[in-house]
Structure formats: C-alpha cells, structure tokens
A protein has these predicted regions:
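Extended, histidine- and acidic-residue-enriched regions that form the cofactor-binding/catalytic faces
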Residues: 1-227
C-alpha cells in the first residue's frame, strides 16, 4: 500500500516520570501497529517542531517552559530540563513540503502525521496544499476520532499521554521520579498523571485510535481508487 506514517516527535520535557521523546515514541508505537494491519511505511521520527515562544531579554522560553491554561500546577517560567526541539513554524512546514515532495515522487498517496500537538496542527494545516501540489491525502490520528476522552495524545504528560506510554512502553514510565510533595510535577497539562493514569486506559485509547485511524485510511484508499 502506498502510504507513509510520520511520527512528529520532540525532545521535550514530559514531567519527571516520562522520557523526553514521549511525543515521537507514542506516535511511532501507534503507527507500527496500524501499519501491521493495513500496510504502509513508518518513517523515522522528527524531533524538531514549532511551539509558542517567549524571549525575555535574551532568555528564550517555549512550550511548557511557560505556565499555560490547563497546567496541572502553576509555576514560574523556566527552561524545562532537556527540552531541545523548537523550530519556527514556517521552517517546519517547509521541511514538511520537502518530505511531501519526496514521498509523492516515490508514489505515496496517503501520509499520516501525528505527535507533538503544535506539530500535528501545523501538519494538518497543510492538508489542502498537500493535495493540490503533491497529490497527497494527509491526516492525523485525530481526523476521524470524535471521542474527546480517547483522542490520542490530547494532553501534555497528563493522564492521557502517561497512560499511552504505560501501554506501549511501560518500562519508560517511572513514578518513583516524582517527589513526594509533587514539587517537580510541573510542565504538565491535563489530568493528574500519577493518580489517574493506567495501562488499561492507555490500551483503551490505543485500540480506539487504531480502529478510527484504520477506518479512515481504508476510506481514503477507496476514494483514491474511485478517482
């Protein structure tokens, strides 16, 4: 089948309990499972991506360096340990254009991209351009997902993402790294990752996403064949 899956990763702080590469790990694990069902090539993950940025007199903060609405705990702006991924959105989309051009040249017709939230949004914004200029149908793991509770990677290191990693790479989740007073549980948006995460919830998210994404890919294949 002429489809490719692009994990939109980052090297980004995901709390003390999760790996820096959590975004790409989650999307890659999803894509490998989907490709086993419907075919396709899982591409190497990206680790750079766009995000909000604030320059405070030469000190640059981006992403979860900055306290945001929905953050689990309020905190002062700080450079989160290990985060090293920021790329200007326009440059990121230029990179995607180059990827689209090469995949189109190779005969790919469908590209699924997912991972880091701002990267996923920037990818999806290019849907019309990808179709008109490169003859590609692009989609994300959210395109055919209607259940907000089960949308894949719909928070930042909260109960959703933590549960997914517990399901796909359980050895990478270590709640023992969270201090007893939870003072290092910052840079997290979503429901409480320690109290509300579970492997069972992660598997529920994974199974729902696989079902909806596979159905979407099959639908697009049918549309392409009928053209």
């Amino acid at each position: 089948r002429r489809s490719s899956d692009l994990p939109l990763g980052t090297l980004e702080w995901h709390g003390p309990h999760m790996p820096l590469g959590a975004d790409g790990i989650q999307s890659k694990e999803l894509f490998v499972r989907v490709a086993e069902k419907v075919g396709g090539v899982v591409l190497p993950m990206l680790f750079m991506g766009p995000d909000r940025l604030f320059d405070d007199r030469g000190t640059v903060f981006y992403g979860m360096d900055i306290n945001t609405e929905g953050a689990l705990n309020t905190y002062c702006a700080q450079q989160m340990k290990g985060s090293a991924y920021w790329m200007e959105k326009g440059l990121f989309q230029d990179l995607l254009r180059s990827i689209f051009a090469q995949l189109s040249r190779a005969g790919v017709r469908i590209v699924v991209g997912h991972g880091h939230g701002p990267s996923t949004n920037a990818f999806q914004e290019m849907k019309e351009e990808a179709e008109e200029k490169y003859g590609l149908c692009i989609m994300t793991a959210w395109t055919y997902a209607d259940d907000e509770r089960l949308k894949y990677q719909n928070d930042h290191a909260g109960a959703n993402e933590t549960s997914i990693v517990m399901a796909v790479r359980p050895e990478l989740v270590d709640f023992g790294q969270v201090k007893e007073d939870e003072s290092n549980l910052i840079g997290i948006a979503g429901r409480h990752p320690v109290r509300e995460s579970s492997e069972a919830f992660g598997n529920e998210i994974l199974e729902y996403t696989m079902k909806t994404l596979i159905a979407g890919i099959e639908k697009e294949y049918k549309t392409i064949k009928e053209r």
